[in-house]
Amino acid sequence: MSVCLTEEQKRKIEENRQRALARRAERLAAQQNSQTNRSLSAPLNAQIPSGQQGVLPSAQSINATGTSRAANSKYAFQKSPSGGNTAPSVPGAAGNKVQAVGNRSHDSKSLTDPAKDVKGNYTVPEAQSVPSGPSNAPNPRHLYPAGTTPGQESAKHSNSYSRPEPLTACDNDTTGPGPLRSTTTITKFYGAGPGSKPAVPVSNKTVSEGRERGVTGSAAEAVPAKKASGATRGRCVKHAESRFRVEVGYSAELIALFKTIPSKNYDPATKMWNFGLEDYASLMSEVQQLQSVELKALEGMEGVQIAPPPATGGGTNINALLAMCNNWQRPSATLRGRCILVSRSRFEMEIGYHAEIIGLFKQMNTRNYDTKTRKWSFMLEDYQKLMESVRNIQQVEVEPLPRPVLQAFAPQFGKTTIIREEIPEVDLSQVDSKLGSNLMPFQRDGVNFAVSREGRLLLADDMGLGKTIQAICIAAYYRKEWPLLVVAPSSVRFTWAEAFQRWLPSIRPESVNVIVTGRDSQSASLINIVSFDLLGKMDKQIAATFQVIIIDESHFLKNVKTARCKAAMPLLKSAKRVMLLSGTPAMSRPAELYTQIAAVRPSFFPRFHDFGIRYCDAKQMPWGWDYSGSSNLNELKLLLEESIMIRRLKSEVLSQLPAKQRKMVVVAPEGITAKTKAALAAAAKEMAKGFKSKVQEKEALLLFYNRTAEAKIRSVLEYIMDLLESGREKFLVFAHHKLVLDHICEELGKKDVPYIRIDGNTSSADRQSLCHKFQMSEKSCVAVLSITAANMGLTLSSADLVVFAELFWNPGVLIQAEDRVHRIGQTSSVNIHYLVAKGTADDYLWPMIQEKIKVLGQAGLSEANFSETTESTDYFYKDPKQKTIYDLFQRSFSEEGAETNADEALLLEACEEADLGDAVCSPTDYSGNSCKRRKIDEYFAL
């Protein structure tokens, strides 16, 4: 039964046939080149079989584009009886006829046998005469003079072979037989690989020099490919301000190239691609390497020097390697394999048994066979040689290394080195001295890496290793290119503002613009901080001006279909410097990592499907493709670390870290409702008044404290959810009010996040079982704890993060709570986050806590020092009203004596009652309750 082929299959078959013919002719040409060189010193007499002879045309009969100049010559191509193109016998460069004979009956083996080269099948014509392109080249086996029948031509040359006139020195650079050349005239005729030099019809000297460069295969530069006679032609035209478009016919090869350009944009209305002018040189450089496409330069840019693509260090041209990524599939192959990068210097070839393949492996000098895995590995310097040899085995298909791997490790393919080159030290003299002097050694390494990658990187350090300070330093290094845009979760926007004011004192506070609403985004400052949700509402013209962008918690962009990702990706691809910060780069879920890679290096994987096939173990299901898996993760890790990612774990830099790292997190004020703001304002106003008794003062403080708890609930929940989304699996959350604890547990329950809760109602037996459950849990788990009920007697060292949703006026209680994780058995540095809300009681509690800790430290009673280990401390700014309230806090909680202790105990008892759910009492409730007051007096009288 006949098999119906689709048009696509027919097209591929025809392409494969044309390529096979081109390779065959190239091998013939290489042999004939050696034979021609011999003819310079010795006559050659050979008997030629009759009936299948032909002559290649001279340079003068073919123009630069490969078309016949029939109008200017009596020689013209004719059709042979067998259907092939025929060509005349024409005068050679020295005035004599240059003839070439091809035997149609020779098999491929005999054509490539060097021992038969002396028989001679071709005499090579002048270099400048040759057009390129296998699909449109005349067949050298069917070439006849115009007006001559095949029979006549056969009779004419049936008994002898006319020896050509010796070539001049400028026509050939070497004599005698020798090894196969990397570039020959027939190679140019049929279109060599991407590294070939074009044949330019100029003086003999120029042609000779061009040939010499092609033969030696210089690694210093990549030479443009000779265009085929049927090449697709187009032009570059100015499109808009700082952009140009390409007007050209359809070319699959060109479309694939377009998709790798960072500034690409496709207009479906005109069906044309346009690009930023900054990518003009790189695009034209790549087009030069395509044989099938020719583009006219952009008007006014004709004189721009188009730098050739870089070559690898040992003579291997990167374009030759990249060319192997095209058309490697062989539908008829019986054995399939693939290449996988296993280290910076070696790759494996995974393939089944095949005698010829094993024979090739044993020819490689750097081969290594692992008897356990039964796999062969080789140094990268053998990659090109091995792949070229494997391609000659028709029954075998081997998937090459991906293009990004070839680009990232390009120097290794020329000369492999196991030791990574040391990244040069960056000059930070232009950065604020306060910032540069506070960088730890590993943080300085991160800055060096970023600058070596031209400010485009994924900073994936573990949590608590100072990604914020590194990002600020990198951005400050590129300060001349500001304005700067910082995109962060809404819960940490003001934390970023505080960090800029602390580490860059040269920046005026009014230069930092925190975008809170959509209306705030209509103007840009020097530093602009916006949430992911508000990014899409920014004015597009303003957003386009940002050339330096920081994305905090960049894993928020993992889903390409979300609005936040759609708003961010165009900005990131067009920006000059992009810093993505993420403590959890999702290496086990490569599909979630794709958008971050595309943001930093758009040219790596223009199509997600290609990435998914290689690294997501993509499978085609009845409903579509499934990209949820993972594959080749080690190769992906090596690729990212070599190109865009730097990641350090706490265990690697633990010796440089303090035991505790405190961080003040300023939560967003918009989380406070208008009603709560009014209540806070009323409470603050009440506190600013004078009070007749200290009890009334304490009661006013208690009311203000409770209002603060209500105001912070929304922001606290948002911060906890951000931590969970960031991949934090186990941490502690301390709060004081029952209202706050209830809301946290309720939200965790809605999200199906496992948690434990320990407060004043939890029995001693239950406490121990809950602690054991938390310690042994291997999955995510959050411990929701009361500050006063769970600040001692518990061990929760399996976590290394503590979050204080509320502050407490007694710093000793806070330090005890911190030590629930900072205990024996803790092997990591502990991170402590204090959530502080402006416009609340935190304005006065936070500086008061720091001052108390400082006094204790000076007295030698405390090792903890908030001011030295907290990332942001310059938070409290006093005005007359704030000063009054602050003095009230200080006076209420710092006086000595039994009366003060009684008042503090009264406040603590009231807070504990609030923790159990009692309503907030009015200012007269406690002062009028003589029984309760007597009970407390009796307690202190004991």
From Swiss-Prot:
SUPFAM superfamilies reported in the protein's UniProt record: P-loop containing nucleoside triphosphate hydrolases
InterPro entries: HARP_dom, Helicase_ATP-bd, Helicase_C-like, P-loop_NTPase, SNF2-like_sf, SNF2/RAD54-like_C, SNF2_N
Alphabetical UniProt keywords: Coiled coil, Hydrolase, Nucleus, Repeat
UniProt-listed Pfam families: HARP (PF07443), Helicase_C (PF00271), SNF2-rel_dom (PF00176)
Catalytic activities: ATP + H2O = ADP + phosphate + H(+)
Positions of the UniProt region annotated as Disordered: 24-214
Principal location class: nucleus
Motif (Nuclear localization signal): 647-664
Sequence motif DESH box, location on chain: 552-555
One cellular component (GO) term of this entry: nucleus
GO terms, molecular function: ATP binding; ATP-dependent DNA/DNA annealing activity; helicase activity; hydrolase activity
Stretches assigned to the HARP domain: 228-299, 331-402
Start-end of Polar residues biased regions: 34-71, 79-88, 129-138, 149-162, 171-187
Any coiled-coil regions, as ranges: 5-29
Top-rank taxon, per record: Eukaryota
Sequence ranges assigned to domain Helicase ATP-binding in this UniProt record: 448-603
Bias type Basic and acidic residues, positions: 104-119
Similarity annotation: Belongs to the SNF2/RAD54 helicase family. SMARCAL1 subfamily.
Record function comment: ATP-dependent annealing helicase that catalyzes the rewinding of the stably unwound DNA. Rewinds single-stranded DNA bubbles that are stably bound by replication protein A (RPA). Acts throughout the genome to reanneal stably unwound DNA, performing the opposite reaction of many enzymes, such as helicases and polymerases, that unwind DNA.
UniProt-recorded name of the protein: SWI/SNF-related matrix-associated actin-dependent regulator of chromatin subfamily A-like protein 1
Source organism: Xenopus tropicalis (Western clawed frog)
